Amino acid sequence: MEGLAGYVYKAASEGKVLTLAALLLNRSESDIRYLLGYVSQQGGQRSTPLIIAARNGHAKVVRLLLEHYRVQTQQTGTVRFDGYVIDGATALWCAAGAGHFEVVKLLVSHGANVNHTTVTNSTPLRAACFDGRLDIVKYLVENNANISIANKYDNTCLMIAAYKGHTDVVRYLLEQRADPNAKAHCGATALHFAAEAGHIDIVKELIKWRAAIVVNGHGMTPLKVAAESCKADVVELLLSHADCDRRSRIEALELLGASFANDRENYDIIKTYHYLYLAMLERFQDGDNILEKEVLPPIHAYGNRTECRNPQELESIRQDRDALHMEGLIVRERILGADNIDVSHPIIYRGAVYADNMEFEQCIKLWLHALHLRQKGNRNTHKDLLRFAQVFSQMIHLNETVKAPDIECVLRCSVLEIEQSMNRVKNISDADVHNAMDNYECNLYTFLYLVCISTKTQCSEEDQCKINKQIYNLIHLDPRTREGFTLLHLAVNSNTPVDDFHTNDVCSFPNALVTKLLLDCGAEVNAVDNEGNSALHIIVQYNRPISDFLTLHSIIISLVEAGAHTDMTNKQNKTPLDKSTTGVSEILLKTQMKMSLKCLAARAVRANDINYQDQIPRTLEEFVGFH
């Protein structure tokens, strides 16, 4: 029956109404109920024949299912739309989101709930607003769709239409008394979303309907949002309409100019100077009431520059692009505040431009500043940390000097991020745990790349001590992957992933130097993963024993000298010797096997099945247990 259900689903998906009817012909009522309620899974989607037919716009199939087989319109599934995964979507939601008007009308006329919500509280009306289908929006509203239902982030239909740039839908919703001043969780209104996206006609429409100029949760007005996003026409429109004070007006112009200086998509150094100069003139417009800047203290990442405080100072850097780039970053940090989520992006972009031009020192200064800002704001920094591993690897590959204090600084930030991501994994909901775990493991790999890079860098004794302290700090936290791997397991494992953007030019695993360094910093040599394997169990399975003999030899020596038990058994009761996959690793292991009397006694206890639980000290119980 399951195979037949697959054919039924395929026919519905492809709009083959006659095939579908033939497949269902002469079936019992219970069989039909099973076949038409069967949830098929494909590419991360879960849907019934009705849902997939509606999603793909097959009106004839939908009509057959509704009128002849009385399929329930409230069936729900999981579908993908524009890269988003939608859980709890009905056929009506899918048809509305995909723009299939005929199917929408069929479903509504057969009693589909126009206000049914998905898991994230999205309605069919919201789906139609996202797609900009005014005809579907009107039809749903005329059939009692509630325009005020917001999703789980309190984001309304008006907001999504404003952000996506659907002017006609926005106008219609406003005419239907949608609230232009409703706020999303982040504190943003429809005007914020329209301003950020640069939809000037929608901004005009919202102003006409008396949309209020308010700050969002990050202290940003629609005017500031437009300026930060380089939407000059929206900024000028809001300045001409909005009743804003002199300081707000000046800061909007400054922010606009500053944003043009370091924006990948909208870079325009001429506009940078133009708007910064306009703002400066406004500061000095009234000689009796000059509005002085409250400049930031000099910041090392910005070359310890001080922001221009008068027209003459600004004129002096007009032809100096580098100075204008730094001026832009300083202005943004002053106006937005160091804790603003958007401050770091242009800093990272400018650093990347320096890296592309082989100006690595400038790049690292900026990226370290951005990293500190993001960690201070409790942002996820796994991409930032990986970026450092990539640029350090590139530098080593090009024989450029990587400074040990820079590595130590990034390692310190990495330890902090891993500690925070360990807590996130513990406290996060089941729905988000997979992503959180991915980020956490990515941080562990990045830490190992940085340790590997440190072994290829000239370090003073003092610098090496500082680096070792960070390694010790992380080892002390005992971070584990899903498989229960410690840092030591990862260091000796050929399956440890290595990022392929510059990093794999410098880093590889198993890695003898990283293994030795981890052991020197206190890594537990006999720690086991979820399968009871120690690092020694892992390395003896290395499949390049000839071409990479030195690595294999060095790691086995390091592990044994650090106290690895060569007779330790895993959950399959296998010792490292049993797990050895090559003659070379077997020989290396045998030459290193120095069985202590303590180990021989423990093996004898296990081999003869002697009861030792609660008969010997607890520390010895564990020792006997892994033999």
UniProtKB/Swiss-Prot annotation:
Tell me where the TPR repeats sit in this chain. Answer: 344-377
Q: Which residues bind Zn(2+) 1?
A: H185
ANK repeat residue intervals: 45-74, 87-116, 120-149, 153-182, 186-215, 218-248, 483-527, 531-568
The record gives the effect of mutating Y163A as: Strongly reduced binding to -Gly-Leu-Asp-Arg C-degron at the C-terminus
Q: Where is the signal peptide?
A: none
Please list the tissues where expression of this protein has been recorded.
Answer: Widely expressed. Highly expressed in testis. Weakly expressed in other tissues.
Keyword Iron-sulfur assigned to the entry: answer is: no
Activity regulation field: Activity of the CRL2(FEM1B) complex toward FNIP1 is inhibited by BEX family proteins (BEX1, BEX2, BEX3, BEX4 and/or BEX5) in absence of reductive stress. Mechanistically, BEX proteins act as pseudosubstrate inhibitors that associate with FEM1B via zinc in absence of reductive stress, thereby preventing association between FEM1B and FNIP1.
- Where does this protein chiefly localize? cytoplasm
CC per GO annotation: Cul2-RING ubiquitin ligase complex; cytoplasm; cytosol; mitochondrion; nucleoplasm; nucleus; ubiquitin ligase complex
Provide the effect of D82A. Abolished binding to -Gly-Leu-Asp-Arg C-degron at the C-terminus
Q: Which residues bind Zn(2+)?
A: C186
Per UniProt, subunit arrangement is:
Component of a CRL2 E3 ubiquitin-protein ligase complex, also named ECS (Elongin BC-CUL2/5-SOCS-box protein) complex, composed of CUL2, Elongin BC (ELOB and ELOC), RBX1 and substrate-specific adapter FEM1B. Homooligomer. Interacts with PPM1F and PHTF1. Interacts with the death domain of FAS/TNFRSF6 and TNFRSF1A. Interacts with CHEK1. Interacts with NKX3-1.
Name by which UniProt lists this protein: Protein fem-1 homolog B
Which organism is this protein's natural source?
Homo sapiens (Human)
